[in-house]
Amino acid sequence: DEGLRGYAQVVQNKDEIIKEVRRQIKNGVDWIKVHVTGLIPNQKEEGEISVWSFDELKLVCDLAHDLGTPVVGHVRNAKGVKDSIKAGMDFILHATFMDEEAIDLVCETKTPIAPSFTFQANLADFGQAIGASEDYRQIFKKEIDDNAEIFNKIHEAGVPLICGSESGFSITPYGEWHYRELEVFVKDIGMTNLEAITCATKNASKSVKMENKVGTLEEGMLADLLIVDGDPLKDITILGDKSKLSHIFQNGKEIKRDQESREITPPQGWRLSPFSDGILTQELAKK
């Protein structure tokens, strides 16, 4: 990736980092996201490789914060988690493969984390429907199994966990799997249904610094409401059952859903998964 796919921009040195952070903030971004870790050919260890130094991460965080902008990082190894928190990152995506030192640091700082396990869970549970190999399915299932206990531990310690959907990839197309992370939080991490719902609403709004607008049902907040036919405190999957979605309100206005659903078309090439050969919809997963 040379910075030409999607919205990413590759930077190579201090000057490029400063220039790019300033450019993005000038253009009005709400957050700066850093891909702290990544995959490399012939990789041997689990997780990903740290591709940013601590000094580089500190430069991004200090500069962005000086310009009033928070920073989030994609991190999938222990070193990356520790470096990101020490550099001042506001929020971490994934945070898998943590060691004890990283766990202690997360618990001490209460840095918000979004595991975003929906991608892995869909591939593990429904991968056969889209041509994923059994090897890949087991790899992603193992990532959830190996890290679920860690997330339960930090959740019990008061670390804010929030629900990320990974929506937009062929395995997690928009409009299909937004509820799925709540199911993973209940089934794998061991939360109650209400705790998972809180992670998707109140915790999420605080973590992305929007708690004065969304996340709770209070006077003065945006009236974004999902009314379902059933009790999600008894069955969390109701939130993903389109036949059970009674009413949807956005900013106080009901969203009309009497039109036929639009066909889900293939995403951009860079969002196609090398692990599958199709788009995973709920309908396909149930076959």
Label the predicted regions.
Residues 66, 143-231:
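His/Asp/Glu-enriched, well-ordered alpha-helical/loop segment
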Residues 21-34, 40:
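Alpha/beta enzyme core
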Residues 156, 201-287:
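Active-site microenvironment of metallo-dependent hydrolases
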Residues 1-19, 70:
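Active-site mouth loops of central-metabolism enzymes
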Residues 28, 32, 64, 166, ...:
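Conserved, mostly hydrophobic/aromatic
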Residues 12-25, 75-80:
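Short, acidic/polar
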Residues 36-149, 162, 167-169, 188-191, ...:
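Active-site core of metal-dependent hydrolases
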